[in-house]
């Protein structure tokens, strides 16, 4: 099939066979796994996944690709959901779900936050993303890439940077490097928040002006007495605080 990549869907099709094999090996699909692929494109990962799985689910928004897949793969092996991944309820497929995908780079962060809402149904996730986004996902405190995305994902997920992928592995070639990442939800949260919505608001406020100190960004939420009780220096910036520190602030305010 000759398919012209559609910019509005952020399409870049993976074509490098050696890299595809490396990704499949990292995912390590087992025959009985319940797996869903987001944005299968022209089947670069779909075909090798189907060779190892009894059945595969895919979520695809492009009607041309859906039509091609319907004529290319047997229905008893592949279930196609014609849907926007940002609106899709992944929990409707299974409570023990493995998620994979070459995510559209233009909506990758919203998809990641949407998947956080589906984490109770997910065993693990493997994604191809813009390298800069993966670096933010796995970033440690006090590093340049560390931010809101790092904190909110690392609160729920163990993150692992697996592989850097060059632009020439895709058609069309993106203007940036890509990377493959593994995200595994914690079965027991290492630092549970009493109020996760409050945690989200605190993290958003703290990073809204990342060059300002916590005393300024959390003004009206936490005073010097609160900082002292938590043992947190109010002169620090958000980028200096580990996820556990933000949870401590949220739990102090929720008490």
Swiss-Prot record:
Signal peptide: none annotated. Its main location: cytoplasm. It is found in: Cytoplasm. It catalyses: adenosine(1518)/adenosine(1519) in 16S rRNA + 4 S-adenosyl-L-methionine = N(6)-dimethyladenosine(1518)/N(6)-dimethyladenosine(1519) in 16S rRNA + 4 S-adenosyl-L-homocysteine + 4 H(+). GO terms for molecular function: 16S rRNA (adenine(1518)-N(6)/adenine(1519)-N(6))-dimethyltransferase activity; RNA binding. Gene3D superfamilies: Ribosomal RNA adenine dimethylase-like, domain 2, Vaccinia Virus protein VP39. Pfam families: RrnaAD. Its EC number is 2.1.1.182. One of its GO terms (cellular component) is cytosol. Belongs to the class I-like SAM-binding methyltransferase superfamily. rRNA adenine N(6)-methyltransferase family. RsmA subfamily. This is Ribosomal RNA small subunit methyltransferase A. The lineage of its organism: Bacteria, Pseudomonadati, Pseudomonadota, Betaproteobacteria, Nitrosomonadales.
């Amino acid at each position: 099939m000759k398919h012209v990549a559609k910019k509005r869907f952020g399409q870049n099709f993976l074509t490098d066979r050696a890299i595809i094999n490396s990704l499949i090996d990292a995912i390590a699909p087992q025959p009985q796994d319940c797996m869903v692929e987001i944005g299968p494109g022209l089947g670069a990962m779909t075909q090798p996944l189907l060779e190892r799985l009894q059945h595969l689910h895919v979520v695809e928004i492009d009607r041309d690709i859906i039509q091609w897949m319907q004529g290319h793969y047997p229905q008893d092996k592949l279930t196609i959901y014609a849907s926007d991944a940002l609106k899709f309820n992944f929990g409707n497929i299974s409570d023990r779900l493995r998620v994979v995908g070459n995510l559209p780079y233009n909506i990758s962060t919203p998809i990641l936050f949407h998947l956080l809402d589906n984490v109770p149904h997910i065993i693990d996730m493997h994604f191809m993303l813009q390298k800069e986004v993966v670096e933010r996902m796995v970033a440690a405190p006090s590093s340049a890439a560390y931010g809101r995305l790092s904190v909110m994902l690392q609160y729920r997920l163990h993150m692992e940077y697996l592989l850097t992928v060059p632009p020439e592995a895709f058609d069309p070639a993106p203007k940036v490097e890509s990377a493959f990442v593994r995200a595994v939800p914690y079965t027991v949260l290492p630092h549970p928040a009493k109020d996760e919505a409050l945690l989200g608001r605190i993290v958003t406020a703290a990073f809204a002006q990342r060059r300002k100190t916590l005393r300024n960004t959390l003004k009206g939420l936490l005073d010097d007495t609160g900082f002292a009780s938590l043992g947190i220096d109010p002169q620090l910036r958000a980028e200096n605080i580990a996820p556990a520190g933000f949870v401590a602030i949220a739990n102090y305010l929720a008490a």
